[in-house]
Amino acid sequence: MLAYMSEQTIALVTGANKGIGYEIAAGLGALGWRIGIGARDRERGAEAVAALSARGVDAFAVPLDVTDDADVSAAARLLEENEGRLDVLVNNAGAAGGWPDEPTSLDPAGLLRLVDTNVVGVIRVTNAMLPLLRRSAHPRIVNQSSHVGSLALQTDPGTDLGGIGGGYAPTKTFLNAVTIQYAAELRGTGILVNNACPGYVATDLNGFSGTRTAEEGARIAIRLATLPDDGPTGGLFDDEGPVPW
């Protein structure tokens, strides 16, 4: 597990006002960390902070729409001014679109919205937070991916991924490639960058049809956020270990 610093570990979790993000925040907060609750909806973000605080978590609100440049810049300034650094970034915020979603009937505008949230949003937030992460003794970046983004699993006739996801699945494949590039560029800096596959979790993204709880889905992101300094980087993981690209 992450070697603890003398100061409290500071983490930011995007999309943390509900679902998997909320449980990631709760799990990391249970370690005694100070958790920034990134949320696009200010009111829901404040409610999540209140609920986590009632559970003993040291949480604070970070208004954050990952698709908005000004919002992301403001979030980085807030962390700079109030915390001075960032130890762990969990890019959890995401959008799903429809499912199943055949590529022959995709709405290009809808696809671009998915890419802006699931891929560009991760890049936007990561780049804004990197100066703060570089000040950490044990920096970690965890990106929320999915089994449906794995090309190996998509092309395996024995793997059931629940149908065709012509919009959502490619954004997670794109995110996987982005994570590999970040890990390659940041190798040797101490910043470990990995992708988490939470499994088929019951959230509002799938109409709560998933077979896993949000708490179960949060486990792998928590594990990757607390990797030791000699842990892996540039990988895709679920609860059972590495997932093929």
Language model regions located:
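A glycine-rich helix->loop->beta "capping" turn
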Residues: R55-V57, L78-N91, G97-W99, D107
